[in-house]
C-alpha cells in the first residue's frame, strides 16, 4: 500500500513484543483487519480514525491520545485531514499466536500476522 509506511522501533524476542511506528496518509484507510492479541497505541501526530466494517466512523484519536486495546471486532483505520503517525505496541507474548488477521471484503482471513512474521519483516527492513 502506497499510503502506509512503518518503522520498527523494537522487537523483543524474550517478551514477544513488537513496537513500531505506522504512518497512514491523510484521508486514506488501511486494509480491514482484526486484532487477535493485546496492543496499545499512542497517536504522535494527526488524528487516527477507526471505522466499522460498514465504513461508519468508530473513533477519532488525536495526537497525544493513548489507548490500550484487546482482541476485538474487524475494523479499518487511517489518517484524518493530515497524515497520522501512530506508535503501536503489539503484545502477543508468544511466537506463533496471531497478532492480527488481514481480512477481505467478505471478512475472510487472507493473511495472519504473528510475532515470527513481524520478526521476518523487521529483518527485511533492516537489511
Regions inferred by a protein language model and the residue ranges of each:
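Glycine- and acidic-residue-biased ligand/ion/polar-headgroup-sensing regions
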Residues: 25-26, 35-54
Amino acid at each position: 500500500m502506497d499510503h502506509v509506511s512503518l518503522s520498527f522501533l523494537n522487537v523483543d524476542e524474550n517478551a514477544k513484543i513488537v513496537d513500531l511506528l505506522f504512518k497512514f496518509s491523510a484521508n486514506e484507510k488501511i486494509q480491514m483487519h482484526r486484532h487477535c492479541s493485546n496492543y496499545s497505541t499512542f497517536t504522535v501526530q494527526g488524528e487516527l480514525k477507526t471505522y466499522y466494517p460498514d465504513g461508519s466512523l468508530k473513533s477519532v484519536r488525536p495526537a497525544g491520545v493513548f489507548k490500550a486495546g484487546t482482541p476485538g471486532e474487524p475494523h479499518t483505520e487511517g489518517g484524518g485531514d493530515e497524515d497520522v503517525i501512530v506508535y503501536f505496541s503489539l503484545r502477543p507474548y508468544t511466537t506463533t499466536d496471531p497478532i492480527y488477521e488481514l481480512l477481505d471484503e467478505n471478512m475472510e482471513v487472507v493473511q495472519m500476522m504473528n510475532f515470527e512474521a513481524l520478526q521476518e519483516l523487521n529483518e527485511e527492513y533492516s537489511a
